[in-house]
Amino acid sequence: MFLLYEYDIFWAFLIISSAIPVLAFLISGVLSPIRKGPEKLSSYESGIEPIGDAWLQFRIRYYMFALVFVVFDVETVFLYPWAMSFDVLGVSAFIEVFIFVLILILGLVYAWRKGALEWS
C-alpha cells in the first residue's frame, strides 16, 4: 500500500522552505536597480580604500589549529544531544559515546605528539 499521504506535512514543509529562498532571489533580482560602473567593480573593505594586494598566504599552522578546532566543535555538536537524553538512552549509549570520545582523545594525543599543536 502506498502511504505517501502520511508525509503530507513533510512535503509541504519541504516545498515551502525551498520556495521561499528561490522567491527571495527572484524578487530581489527583478526589483533591484542595475547600475554598472567602476565603483561596483572595486573591492570593498569596510568603507576604506583597499591598499595592496588582497591575496596573502597563511602559514600551515593556522590550518592545523583550524582542523583540530573543527574536530572538537563537531564533537560538541554530537555530544550535546546525547547529554540531553542521557537518562533515556541507557548504558549502551554511554559505552558508545565513551568509545567515540576515546577515539577523539587518541586523535588529539596523536596531533600533540606530532607537534601540530605547538606554535613555533
From Swiss-Prot:
What does this gene product do? NDH shuttles electrons from NAD(P)H:plastoquinone, via FMN and iron-sulfur (Fe-S) centers, to quinones in the photosynthetic chain and possibly in a chloroplast respiratory chain. The immediate electron acceptor for the enzyme in this species is believed to be plastoquinone. Couples the redox reaction to proton translocation, and thus conserves the redox energy in a proton gradient.
Question: Is tRNA processing one of the keywords?
Answer: no
Q: Which Gene3D superfamilies match?
A: NADH:ubiquinone/plastoquinone oxidoreductase, chain 3
| Any one GO BP annotation for this protein | photosynthesis, light reaction
Q: For this protein, what is the EC number?
A: 7.1.1.-
| UniProt keyword Translocase present | yes
Enzyme class comes to translocase
Q: How does it assemble?
A: NDH is composed of at least 16 different subunits, 5 of which are encoded in the nucleus.
Which organism is this protein's natural source? Arabis hirsuta (Hairy rock-cress)
Location in the cell = Plastid, Chloroplast thylakoid membrane
GO cellular component, as recorded: chloroplast thylakoid membrane; NADH dehydrogenase complex
**Membrane topology recorded in Swiss-Prot or TrEMBL:** Multi-pass membrane protein
Keywords from the UniProt entry: Chloroplast, Membrane, NAD, NADP, Plastid, Plastoquinone, Quinone, Thylakoid, Translocase, Transmembrane, Transmembrane helix, Transport
Q: Which gene encodes it?
A: ndhC
Assign the protein's first listed, main location to one coarse class. Answer: plastid
Q: Which reaction does it catalyse?
A: a plastoquinone + NADH + (n+1) H(+)(in) = a plastoquinol + NAD(+) + n H(+)(out); a plastoquinone + NADPH + (n+1) H(+)(in) = a plastoquinol + NADP(+) + n H(+)(out)
Q: Which terms does the record give in the GO molecular function aspect?
A: NADH dehydrogenase (ubiquinone) activity; quinone binding
Q: Give the UniProt family note.
A: Belongs to the complex I subunit 3 family.
Give me the segments passing through the membrane. 9-29, 64-84, 88-108
Protein name per UniProt: NAD(P)H-quinone oxidoreductase subunit 3, chloroplastic
Tell me, what's a Pfam family for it? Oxidored_q4
Q: Which InterPro entries match?
A: NAD(P)H_OxRDtase_bac/plastid, NADH_UbQ/plastoQ_OxRdtase_su3, NDAH_ubi_oxred_su3_sf
Q: What is the lineage of its organism?
A: Eukaryota, Viridiplantae, Streptophyta, Embryophyta, Tracheophyta
